């Protein structure tokens, strides 16, 4: 365990902050004086070659850690767990011609890292990023942020669950209705599609169920698959 320092903070969407720390990698946690450190795993939103360590953190009212992280100022320090973990390794799901990245809220983070690197998703001809959140303002600002950071050709679609927008509704519902495929001009088939999911547990669970019905599953016990997931908690 070691200490890292915040070098910059900016709000990229309502209550969603980009936090840039000094390296190295791992999980971050904030420890108050006299308390045990509170650790949470956050996906890294930057290239391994970057000088700083970047995260997207949504400030959740009443949360044990996120409000404190989002209130940090440059120069403040946090504790870092040196053990980095992750499941979204695109090399584990080869094949297909289209990679779908489906994110809710700050689950966008790993896809900022992937689309900001020209080599990570180079095996696929088409890259589709779908961002879901409650409000149109949040998804629009997250989409603008993703577009500004991308270094590869990228189709970005947004879905606001509580307001009218480019797509209206939760991502699983848009998959079930066919609206998401129609908007993207691409299909969820095991032959063509590879999926990366990062977001809240309900979104992950429902999307996996819908994909299983289409024979799109995670690789397991040596069997190939087409889908990888990373849950926010």
Model-derived regions: residue spans:
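Histidine-anchored nucleotide/phosphate-binding helix
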Residues: 110-120
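Reductase modules of NAD(P)H-dependent flavoproteins
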Residues: 130-233
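Ser/Thr-glycine-rich phosphate-binding loops at phosphate-binding pockets of nucleotides
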Residues: 104-109
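Ferredoxin-reductase
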Residues: 1-74
């Amino acid at each position: 365990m070691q200490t890292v320092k915040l070098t910059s903070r900016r709000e990229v969407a309502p209550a969603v902050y980009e936090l840039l720390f000094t390296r190295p990698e791992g999980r971050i946690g904030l420890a108050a004086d006299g308390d045990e450190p509170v650790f949470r795993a956050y996906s890294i939103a930057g290239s391994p070659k970057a000088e700083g360590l970047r995260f997207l953190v949504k400030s959740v009212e009443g949360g044990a850690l996120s409000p404190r992280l989002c209130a940090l100022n440059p120069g403040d320090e946090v504790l870092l767990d040196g053990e980095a973990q992750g499941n979204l390794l695109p090399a584990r799901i080869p094949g297909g011609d289209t990679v779908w990245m489906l994110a809710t809220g700050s689950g966008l983070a790993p896809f900022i890292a992937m689309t900001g690197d020209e080599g990570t998703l180079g095996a696929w001809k088409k890259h589709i990023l779908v961002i879901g959140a409650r409000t149109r303002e949040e998804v629009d600002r997250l989409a603008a942020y993703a577009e500004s950071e991308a270094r590869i050709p990228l189709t970005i679609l947004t879905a606001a669950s509580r307001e009218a927008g480019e797509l209206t509704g939760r991502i699983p519902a848009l998959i079930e209705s066919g609206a998401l495929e129609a908007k993207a001009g691409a299909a969820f088939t095991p032959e063509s599609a590879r999926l990366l999911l990062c977001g809240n547990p309900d979104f992950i669970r429902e999307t996996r169920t819908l994909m299983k019905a289409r024979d799109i599953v995670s690789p397991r016990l040596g069997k190939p698959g087409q889908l990888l997931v990373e849950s926010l908690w």
